[in-house]
């Protein structure tokens, strides 16, 4: 399943790129602070798993995702996550009921930052290489997440290192993360402040054999 998914991704990238630029093996880059909209799609079945606004602090490695109220095709509460990658924990927040779960985060890898072990594959143009206003120059990176045995491919802009999309696949899941309406700043720093009803919450024990990471969290919504 993983091999097929990555082969399909390669074909999609080739069809989407109208001109190939010479690659000089760029150095690993770091995303800026960002505010934007993140959409998560399961490629098996085409289901939109979640879509909503996020804030990402690239310095302190903090991410807040709040699901859009437009995505109401499910009976559960709207997803609201605060992920503290440096601390290795995340909070599942229910603002409506003022409840909170605190759980371990077993991997630092996520779709809004190029993972540390990402290997550069190619630099190319999306759009037209002759009309400057109609193209975007991007890098494609690939790698794997040791903690989850998943593989990923990340599309970042050349220069700012904005992650436009991330493809992630394991033997059991295949997800596409799309990043849009990006502003390179954190507009509301208070989004990273833990709600008062979460402050005294104890860390829940992770079931044996389970790994909590950014990708699996969105797969289960």
Swiss-Prot record:
Membrane-crossing residue ranges in chain numbering: none
Name of this chain's protein: Ependymin-2
Gene Ontology CC: extracellular region; lysosome
Annotated source species: Salmo salar
Keywords: Calcium, Glycoprotein, Secreted, Signal
GO biological process: cell-matrix adhesion
Modified how: Binds calcium through the terminal sialic acids.
InterPro entries, A to Z: Ependymin (IPR001299), Ependymin_CS (IPR018224)
A Pfam family that the UniProt record links to this protein: Ependymin
Leader sequence segment: 1-21
Biological role stated in the UniProt entry: May play a role in neural plasticity. May be involved during axon regeneration.
Gene: epd2
Family label: Belongs to the ependymin family.
Tissue: EPDs are synthesized in the meninx and secreted in the cerebrospinal fluid.
